[in-house]
Amino acid sequence: MGEDMEKTMRFGFDKEKNTKHKALLLTIYEALQEKGYNPINQLVGYLLSGDPAYITSHKNARNLIRKIERDELLEELLKVYLERE
């Protein structure tokens, strides 16, 4: 058991999901904006807490956000942020 605790685990995702996630995230962003919320703040609240109550039900956004695993979304966001010039 001690050896297992010393190994670094690998974490990976299916790259094909990226395009689908972007489309869903844009729809969610627009729905939040249309309802007068700050989309970034609301999405951060959701990502930190996992509580879908941070996302409006307008345009079915709350159900859409549940289709994206939070860890996958965080991975994609970090990748884009770190690869920016």
Swiss-Prot record:
InterPro entries: IreB. It holds the Pfam family IreB. Belongs to the UPF0297 family. HAMAP family: UPF0297. NCBIfam families: PRK05473.1. This is UPF0297 protein CHY_0540.
